[in-house]
């Protein structure tokens, strides 16, 4: 096993054996990740084992409605809608679970979100949890549910930036 660093998905990466145990996330990687990235909708950083993708996430710009956002995100008279960065998917092949691949991908995503917000603006990092297990996972990273939808979770860019600096990540 020789895990790569995190790099953008390309045509050399093999996707056919990826299985995170969640069919929707498997299907998105196989059916949409390359096309969405090529069309500029999403960036898809991956970790691979000798070319076979073992973990990935999708990153895209997005917006949230102020009435959905927690107070920490909607203070200071933000625009309507509020610009954000969306971690649209996050998955690790079940054969690589518990090896730090997911944590590494989350930290990379958070760094990229802070860097992106420094360039184009953005008030929050937003995730859309696929199920209750994913909701709990993102809450363990300090994300809080939207006021109107517990499957949409967010964390302010300022909070993420401070957390990354404080933890020495």
Language-model regions, residue ranges each:
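Conserved acyl-donor/pantetheine-binding loop and adjacent beta-alpha core of acyl/acetyltransferases
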Residues: 42, 56-89
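Conserved acetyl-CoA-binding loop-helix of GNAT-fold acetyltransferases
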Residues: 98-112
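Short amphipathic alpha-helix that is part of the acyltransferase structural core
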Residues: 1-35, 39, 44
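A short, internal acetyl-CoA/4′-phosphopantetheine-binding micro-motif in the GNAT/acyltransferase core
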Residues: 88-98
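Conserved active-site alpha-helix within GNAT-family acetyltransferase domains
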Residues: 114, 120-121, 128-148
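A glycine-centered beta-loop-beta connector
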Residues: 48-53
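Short glycine/proline-centered loop/turn elements that form peptide/ligand docking sites
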Residues: 106, 131-134, 150-157
């Amino acid at each position: 096993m020789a895990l790569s660093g995190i790099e953008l998905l390309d045509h050399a990466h093999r996707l056919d054996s990826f299985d995170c145990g969640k069919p929707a996330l498997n299907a998105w990687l196989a059916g949409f990740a390359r096309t969405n990235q090529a069309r500029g909708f999403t960036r898809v950083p991956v970790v691979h084992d000798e070319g076979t993708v073992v973990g990935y996430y999708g990153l895209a710009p997005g917006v949230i409605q102020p009435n959905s956002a927690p107070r920490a995100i909607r203070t200071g008279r933000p625009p309507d809608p509020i610009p954000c960065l969306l971690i649209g998917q996050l998955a690790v092949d079940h054969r690589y679970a518990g090896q730090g691949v997911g944590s590494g991908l989350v930290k990379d995503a958070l760094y990229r979100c802070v860097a992106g917000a420094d360039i184009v603006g953005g008030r929050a990092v937003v995730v859309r949890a696929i199920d209750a297990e994913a909701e709990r996972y993102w809450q363990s990273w300090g994300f809080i549910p939207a006021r109107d939808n517990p499957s949409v979770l967010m964390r302010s860019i300022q909070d993420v930036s401070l957390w990354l600096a404080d933890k020495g990540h």
